[in-house]
Amino acid sequence: MLEVNTYFDGTVKSIAFQTATLPATVGVMAKGEYTFGTDCKEIMTVVSGELIVQLPNQEEWQTFIDGQTFEVEANQSFNLKVPVETAYLCKYIR
């Protein structure tokens, strides 16, 4: 069953689903800055657009564009700058 999630007053929306192997969400972020927390390990892929990411315990920011992936371990938080509306796929490792 699909589940729609809305965050940050509607500027981030995702649809949760089950892949063949892992739970996942696919969503869109409006331009802005966000902080997300993880309950489990997350593998995030940019589908379209750009994410500028500050990973946990890192001072520098890294840019990810279409097709690029980054990972965040469980029980961490990470910061995002979204310069253009961006679509993403997030897989959850439980």
From Swiss-Prot:
Q: Which domain of life is it from?
A: Bacteria
UniProt entry keywords in alphabetical sequence: Glycosyltransferase, Transferase
EC assignment: 2.4.2.1, 2.4.2.2
Report which reactions are catalysed by this protein: a purine D-ribonucleoside + phosphate = a purine nucleobase + alpha-D-ribose 1-phosphate; adenosine + phosphate = alpha-D-ribose 1-phosphate + adenine; cytidine + phosphate = cytosine + alpha-D-ribose 1-phosphate; guanosine + phosphate = alpha-D-ribose 1-phosphate + guanine
GO cellular component term, pick one = cytosol
The answer to whether the entry has keyword Repeat is no
The EC class name is transferase
TM region(s), chain numbering: none
GO MF annotations, alphabetized: guanosine phosphorylase activity; purine-nucleoside phosphorylase activity; thymidine phosphorylase activity; uridine phosphorylase activity
Which Pfam families does the entry link to? Ppnp (PF06865)
HAMAP family reported in the protein's UniProt record? Nucleos_phosphorylase_PpnP
Could you tell me what this protein does? Catalyzes the phosphorolysis of diverse nucleosides, yielding D-ribose 1-phosphate and the respective free bases. Can use uridine, adenosine, guanosine, cytidine, thymidine, inosine and xanthosine as substrates. Also catalyzes the reverse reactions.
Task: Indicate the family of this protein.
Answer: Belongs to the nucleoside phosphorylase PpnP family.
User: What is the protein named?
Assistant: Pyrimidine/purine nucleoside phosphorylase
Organism equals Saccharophagus degradans (strain 2-40 / ATCC 43961 / DSM 17024)
